Amino acid sequence: MTATQTPAKEVVEPNSEDTEFVFFSGKGGVGKSTVSCATATWLADNDYDTLLVTTDPAPNLSDIFNQDIGHEVTAIDDVPNLSAIEIDPDVAAEEYRQETIEPMRALLGDEEIQTVEEQLNSPCVEEIAAFDNFVDFMDSPEYDVVVFDTAPTGHTIRLMELPSDWNAELEKGGSTCIGPAASMDDKKADYERAIDTLSDESRTSFAFVGKPESSSIDEIERSASDLAELGISSQLLVVNGYLPESVCEDPFFEGKRADEQAVIDRVESTFDQQALATYPLQPGEIAGLELLSDVGGVLYDGEEATVDVDAATRRATNEDTVDFDTFTDADAVAEELVPVEETRYLFFTGKGGVGKSTIASTTAVSLAEAGYETLVVTTDPAAHLADIFEQPVGHEPTSVGQANLDAARIDQERALEEYRTQVLDHVREMYDEKDDTQIDVEAAVANVEEELESPCAEEMAALEKFVSYFEEDGYDIVVFDTAPTGHTLRLLELPSDWKGFMDLGSLTKGAAPANGGKYDEVIETMQDPSRSSFAFVMYPEFTPMMEAYRAAMDLQDQVGIETSVVVANYLLPEDYGDNAFFENRRAQQAEYLEEISERFDVPMMLAPLRQEEPVGLDDLREFGADVTGLDGVGEDDREEVTVS
């Protein structure tokens, strides 16, 4: 192993006797997990006892290392000094419930225990339980370094905020939706220590991973600024997957490479106070120890980046002709997108970074062009609809310059304020109707106000806003650009979870009038294939395909929702890239398209890689005509819709 001292190596290599921590984050789909795994492998190979932890609800460490990992700390085969764990939010929540309740059983009666159990049925418990695991691993003296492969950017920021938020909540004492505060004094100390450690640059390093694309780097800039406000600075930026110069032999890919290099130049000037490392796109997927070692060698040992076409797995020969069009039926796709008799709700979801927002926006423009009154909404905390439309997109539906089309994004702070107002107004009305002079109304309202300061109120507020879009008047179609896969499942499970919690009689959760019935209607609408369509967006590689498939199965099993459409994005154009590198990647894509078709067995929308991402209405119209199957659908073709 060489001893070259790269800037990236200085960031990740431990230099003290205390356990150190390295966090990798970034827009989903940029190779964050690959870089995390490569870093952990490199550290272990250099004799550091290393633990790799993913807090992403859609983990893929098992796929990268080609072995089962799961919720227990697992030794990685053939890598001494390396262990890994994929935190399972469901398992973590149950463990948290049992750890909270068991010490109380000898002290409290059955009625009191039942009250605690009811509190712990709050959906917020899953969030704090996952974080509880996260905090536990920040107190792991048996390791030299703990590498965190964190959830995609918007949710990572939320995770980073949790220590302060829950600490403030526990300061108040009394009862919380995560259990009685008096039982969690030890948690309070843990959270205080976590806050101190996260902001200690001598022990904690924060690294972003991005693709050489403007949207990816824009996201990193925003996230780095948000982290700085929390007192956490980032020290490393890894630009992953740039096109190697040696394989770009035609104007299309020469142009894409030039664009990428311009982005890398921008990164060098914008992030000049941070270490910068780059790694090229390979002809095949990065999995297995040999390729992970290559990534680590380039990033941390200063080895020259190489592209070995022959090293990629290739199941097709150079003589094979790849015809992507055989995998799609445009009419079948269009049938799943247009309304029948009532307002249709379209959900585009998938692993972050697969082009989900672009596909959702493109589909919305095409539907509006066809004459349907359309609203496109993003529920993703890392939203960028405004960048795609080149128009302001706010909390309330507003026009983006296209007839029949409005757009909105959920502003979490405003949603929380709206929810607080809704709850407090209803509480006051409820006590006014009782007209009981023995009740101290202001004290009761003050108690509710305090409960609304809990971090879990943010989750309920986001849900309320999400549900409100099912009540928007005047739209034939509402298109949801949802958060990345694991978090989308959490959002879609919330109506059922919160309804169950509200049935327990919790004042705050049940303060909004008739919420239970409203949630029932939303659940039924999402489960009705004549009114709701769920489309999984992916690029045709193993990890995004499997994450989408697992998520689709979870949707079916946990929420009773069937997948309607799959979207295969970033297909390599057949007219360009006439060499072994792109032939290999194109053949690989065809192989995965076949597997996607077999696994999902639903209509497939195909979207090609473009010279530039479609931005602005003109680009979106052109792109939509090519990919949605809606070209030619107009006023004369569509049925009369009864809008909500």
UniProtKB/Swiss-Prot annotation:
The keyword Cell cycle does not apply. Its EC number is 7.3.2.7. It comes from the Archaea. ATP binds at residues 26-33, 350-357. It catalyses: arsenite(in) + ATP + H2O = arsenite(out) + ADP + phosphate + H(+). GO terms for molecular function: ATP binding; ATP hydrolysis activity; ATPase-coupled arsenite transmembrane transporter activity. Pfam families: ArsA_ATPase. Induction: By arsenite and antimonite. Disulfide bonds: none annotated. Belongs to the arsA ATPase family. PANTHER family: ARSENICAL PUMP-DRIVING ATPASE ARSENITE-TRANSLOCATING ATPASE, ATPASE GET3. NCBIfam families: ArsA_halo (NF041417), GET3_arsA_TRC40 (TIGR00345). Anion-transporting ATPase. Catalyzes the extrusion of arsenite. Involved in resistance to arsenite and antimonite but not to arsenate. This is Putative arsenical pump-driving ATPase. It comes from Halobacterium salinarum (strain ATCC 700922 / JCM 11081 / NRC-1).
